[in-house]
Each structure stands twice: as structure tokens, then as C-alpha cells.
Amino acid sequence: NLSVGTIVEHVRFGKGNITKIEGVGADTKAEINFANGGLKKLLLRFAKLKVLD
């Protein structure tokens, strides 16, 4: 389950930290600060994020 502070990995942007989650259901977006890609807002249903421990 994704929440603020969760560390995730994205195929294109690499590792990042979730800084904000907004929206409901299919429109849920996460703002993620990626080490290599900067700050991005992604729709979770398309993002294909892998949660890292």
C-alpha cells in the first residue's frame, strides 16, 4: 500500500520518495521526488511503481 514517505522505484525515473497523495480511486495521483528525475506527479493506475523496503 502506498503512502507518504514510501520509497518506490519507477522503470524510467528510478528511486523516489512519495511526498503527497491526492485524489480518489482511478484518479489517485502521487507526487514523487525522484533522485534522478526530480519531482513528478503520476497517476497511480498507470505508474507501475515497485515498493522498496
Q: Where are the model-predicted features located?
A:
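Mixed-charge, Lys/Arg-rich low-complexity intrinsically disordered regions
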Residues: N1-I7
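A short macromolecule-binding patch
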Residues: K29-K48
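Core RecA-like ATPase module of SF1/SF2 helicases and allied nucleic-acid translocases
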Residues: V51-L52
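Short beta-strand-centered aromatic/proline hotspots
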Residues: G14-E22
